[in-house]
Each structure stands twice: as structure tokens, then as C-alpha cells.
Amino acid sequence: MKRIMTTAAVVALSAGMAQAGGVERSTQSVGILFEQGRYAEFNVGGFNPDVSGTVGAGTVSSGDMAPGYGTYSLGYKQALSDKIDIAIVLDQPIGANVGYPAGTGYPLQGSTATVSSNAVTMMMRYKLPNNFSVIGGLRAEQASGEVSLSSGYTMKTSDETDYGYVIGAAWEKPEIAARVSLTYNSKITHDFSASENVMGGVPTSFATTVPESVNLEFQTGIAKDTLLMGSVRWVHWTQFDISPPGYLGASGGVPLVDYSNNSTSWTLGVGRRFNDQWSGALMFGYEKTQPGTTGNLGPTDGYKSVSLAASYQASDNIKITGGVRYVDIGDAITNAPIGGVFSDNSGWGAGVRVGINF
């Protein structure tokens, strides 16, 4: 039960998870370290938000400014001994895809922005007495970005790779499929070279910090073939800003992107095994709306979500899991001078995971 149900839970948690606080597109889970034996997985997903707002007392609409996108991740885990497990994970920790439609009359019509990243995380778990274990690892993260505003401002960064770490601890009670893990992901600061076009092309440089975060993941059996599971994720988003010097000068010191509040995302749900081949999970997610306004390149604030997942044990060593997620995106008012009102927005996410034990 433990292996099948936790797999279903992970996909339910991650399908469309990118709509959580800030620009994150990965929950940075350490769950792969607890898979049995030698294990490999491939995950692919997509999220299709519908985000629009208005100005002029609702008379001018932005149109859908949040195009859909896809994500992927790869993972491999093996035991080096009865006390040591190692894993490597490739994922996309942060990302953004903004595209205000042209011809709407909205102040940012035709503006676009992208943020992309890739990361490789190598982790190790060392088992201690009494079902405790410690976790540690290193992360290499590559990031870049590009923006083009309707005002004529453009900016493109270099691709930069920098490094961070993950540390944590876990406790298990296999008899009831119980597990709790607490992990800390360090911040990673990227020093970008950039080309800005304010009044002509200008080479510049600036630093952006991908923020630190803390993950609490848990599960426990509550009845035969039934698990209660969930997570709490805190992200220090006030560490994150995009502040190219040319843009700062033209805007009077206002960053291109920043966040005035940190985020805490919650998930809670139930998983159940129906038979030796099929299991499923139902998960709920929540991130509260924060006070104040939001950036015009990210006009969302908090969310509520529901996810469904099903897992099929195709053979003794292959399992396939699919999940769908509906997200009710929180209302937001964007920063002055635009002051766009974004409400009644939502999105759908879906993901598929193939896991192989060998």
C-alpha cells in the first residue's frame, strides 16, 4: 500500500502546482528518497491558466495574459547500503510565461515575459536508529529571463548557473505507513549579465535570488488500505526580485518584479488502494490571499485547489500515475499606476508519472 499510495499522492500534489506562490514550478519534494530499492521516474505535466483583468471600472479587459505551459522532471534513486540511500532529481524550480494580448487597449497590451530554469539536485539519506534519518544534498540551478514591455523597454539576461543545498530529517513507522519529513532548501543567488533597451541598448548586470524554502511532508495510515497525507510549504518570496538597473532608473526605483509577502501553501488529502493494481487519491490545496497589490507581470494572489489522481500497477516493477488539478486563482489588484483588477480566474493542470523499480 505504501508504495502505490504515495506515488498517487505526489502526482496529485504536483499536477499544476506551478500556480502556487511566486513563480515556483516545483515543490522540491524529497519523497523519491523513500521509494523502495532501485527506482527511476519520469514526470511530465502541463498547466493551462485563464487569467485576465480590467481597468477603467471594468471597461477595458487585458485578455488572457497567462499562456499555458509544460513541465517535466526526472529522478533516480538507489540504496548504497542498508543505511544509505542516494537520489538525483532534474526539475524546473521556477518559471514564468506572461503574454498580454495585443489590440486590447489594456495598458500592458503586447507585453511579454519569460523566466526559465533547470536544476540538478543530488541528495543522500542516512538512516539512524529508531526510524529516524537525516537528509542532505547539493543543488545546481540554471536560470535566465527575458522581458518586452509595451512601453518599448526590453531586457534579456545571460544564462547563469549557481549552487545551493538541501538539509533535513525524517521519521518513519512502516507498520502504519507513517512518515514525516522536514527539509530546508537554501536560497540561490544568480548574478546576471543583461542587455537592456531603455533609450537604446545598454549592457548591465544585476542579481536575483531564488528564495529559500521549508517543506513539511507527511503521511500515515488511518484504516486498511487508506492513507491520510499532506504537506506544508513555506517560501521566503520577499528575497526574490528582478531589478535591472536601467528599469529601476526609468521607473523611479520600482523593481520589474518583486513580492511584498512570503507564501505558505497547504495540501491535505486521502489516498486509497482499491485492489492490487489500482489506487487513487483526492487532495485539497490552499494558499491564502495576501494584503496589498501584486506585480503587473504576476497578477494572482493565493489559490484554492482540488486534485484527483489514479495509479495503475502495470507490472511488478512498473507503475503509471495520472493526476488532474483544478485551481481557483485568488483575486488581485496590480501595482500603480495601472491598478488592474484581476478576479474570477482559474486554471487546469494535469500530470503523468511513470515509475520503475529494478
How would you name each of these model-derived features?
Residues 21-22, 52-60, 70-73, 79-358:
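Outer-membrane beta-barrel porins/channels
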Residues 2, 8-9, 126, 354:
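Residue-level marker of intrinsically disordered, low-complexity segments enriched
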Residues 4-44, 175-177, 187-188, 278, ...:
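Outer-membrane beta-barrel biogenesis signature
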Residues 3-4, 273:
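Hydrophobic alpha-helical segments, especially transmembrane helices
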Residues 16, 20-68, 73, 77-82:
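Beta-barrel outer-membrane channel/assembly domains of diderm bacteria
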Residues 2-3, 302:
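Short hydrophobic/aromatic segments of transmembrane alpha-helices and their interfaces
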